[in-house]
Every structure is written in structure tokens, then in C-alpha cells.
Amino acid sequence: MKKSFFEYLMTQRNPQPNNEVEEFANQAFFDQVFPKQSRDFDEISKYLELNAGYLQSMSIFDSAWQRYLESEQF
């Protein structure tokens, strides 16, 4: 069964973040209304654009999404 994007993102959490994706994962963990079951790029992207003040740039999401897609190929 494929993971949702949020499930994948939680694998990137790190108490001492080394990059922007890890920081994004740490912050998303505390976002109680994040679309946790979604696998849809547009749904998550729109949510983040409107609600995620903790995300400095949407390019961070794009990078995380690309890693998510790569992880789902295996």
C-alpha cells in the first residue's frame, strides 16, 4: 500500500534538521489540519500555500514531493 505524502514526510523528521525538507517535516508534524491522508499534489500544494506559514518557500515542498515520488517507485 502506498504511503500518503504526510506519512512519507514524517520519515524525514530530524530533531537536529540538516536541510529544509527535514525542517519542513518537523513543522508539519505540529500542523493539526495538514491533509494527512492525501496523495494528491494539487490538494497538498493548495493547502500549504494558504495555511503553512512555517514553509518558507514552495520549492521546499516541491523537493519533498520529488523525494516522495522517488520513494514510491520501490
From Swiss-Prot:
It holds the Pfam family YozE_SAM_like. It comes from the Bacteria. InterPro entries: UPF0346 (IPR010673), YozE_SAM-like (IPR023089), YozE_SAM-like_sf (IPR036806). SUPFAM superfamilies: YozE-like. Belongs to the UPF0346 family. This is UPF0346 protein PEPE_1063. It comes from Pediococcus pentosaceus (strain ATCC 25745 / CCUG 21536 / LMG 10740 / 183-1w).
